[in-house]
Amino acid sequence: MRHRRRPGGRSTAGGTPVSQLSIPSPSIEAFHLGPLTIHIYALCILAGIVVAYISGGRRYQARGGKQEQFEELCALAVIAGIIGGRLYHVITDHQLYFGPGRTWYHCFFIWQGGLGIWGAISLGGLAIWLYCRRKGIRFASVADSLAPGILAAQAIGRLGNWFNQELFGRPTSLPWGLEIDLSHRPAGYLQYATFHPTFLYELVWSLVGAVFLLWVDRRWTLDHGRLFTLYVAIYTFGRFWVERLRIDPAHHVGQWRLNDVTALVVFTGAVVILIVLQRRYGKGDEHSSCPAHKTR
C-alpha cells in the first residue's frame, strides 16, 4: 500500500520529510480488465516497441527497403530481444529466482519487471543480422534506420520502472526527488523517503539522444552503421553516469557495478568503431546513403 502524504508535504511512512516539490510514485502497478491483469510495465514496453517500429519502418523505406521485410525482421527482433533481455536479467540476478526460499518459475514472470538491455540488444541484433544475411539485406542500413526509434523506445520503457517503483538512485533532498513507498525501499534505506529518479534521468537522456540522432542524420546522413554506433555511444555514456547513482542490488567487478563496467567497455568500443567508420566513409552528406539491399 502506498503511504500518503499529510498536508504540508510530509510522509506518513516515517523517516525523512518528503518535499512538497518531490515526484510522487504511482499508486498502482497494474489494473484489471475482467479476468485479465494488465501490468503497466508491460504496456510501457509495448508502447516503446510500437514507437521503434513506426519510426524504423519509415526510415527504412526511405532508404529503399521493403516494408514486408521490415515487418518480418522486427517480429523476429522483438521476440529475440525480449528473450535476450530476460535471460540477461535472470543470469545476472539469479539469486532472485534460485536458492533457498526462492521460487524458480518466477523467472518467467516477465510482467513483474526485469529486462536487461544488454541481452535485449545483443540477441535482438543477432536475429536481425541473421535475417539480413539470409535475405541479402544490408544490416547496417537496418541498424541505422532503427537507431533513433530504439533510443526513444528505451525512454518510454523507463516509465515502467516508475510504476514498479524500482531501479531508483541514492537518497536525495533535491526538489525532484522521487517518493518511494516504505515497502519498496531497500534494506538500509528505510529511513529515507525520496531518492534520485534515475528512471527520469535516463528517460530524458534517451529522448534528447533520439532527437540528436535524428538531427545528425538529417544534417549529415550518417550511414554504413555510423548512426547506430553513435546511438550505442550515446546510450552507454548516459547509462554509465546514471548507473553510478543506483542502489539496487547488483553484481560487482571490484568496486564497480557490472552494468558500469559493461557500459564503459561498450562505450569505448563504440567510439573506436565510430572513428574507424568515419575515416572509411567520410563525413557524409544528404546525397550519400547506404542502400537497404546489397548489390548482386
Swiss-Prot record:
Transmembrane segments: 34-54, 72-92, 108-128, 136-158, 195-215, 227-243, 258-278
The protein's name in its UniProt record: Phosphatidylglycerol--prolipoprotein diacylglyceryl transferase
Entry's Gene Ontology BP terms: lipoprotein biosynthetic process
Sorted UniProt keywords: Cell membrane, Membrane, Transferase, Transmembrane, Transmembrane helix
Record family assignment: Belongs to the Lgt family.
Classification via PROSITE patterns: LGT (PS01311)
Protein residues bound to a 1,2-diacyl-sn-glycero-3-phospho-(1'-sn-glycerol): 158
GO molecular function: phosphatidylglycerol-prolipoprotein diacylglyceryl transferase activity
Key word Mitochondrion present: no
E.C. no: 2.5.1.145
Membrane topology classification: Multi-pass membrane protein
A Pfam family of this chain: LGT
Enzyme class per UniProt: transferase
Top-rank taxon, per record: Bacteria
GO cellular component: plasma membrane
Role description: Catalyzes the transfer of the diacylglyceryl group from phosphatidylglycerol to the sulfhydryl group of the N-terminal cysteine of a prolipoprotein, the first step in the formation of mature lipoproteins.
Membrane listed as a keyword: yes
Organism encoding this protein: Cutibacterium acnes (strain DSM 16379 / KPA171202) (Propionibacterium acnes)
Subcellular location: Cell membrane
Region feature (Disordered): 1-21
Pathway the protein acts in: Protein modification; lipoprotein biosynthesis (diacylglyceryl transfer)
Predominant subcellular localization, coarse grouping: membrane
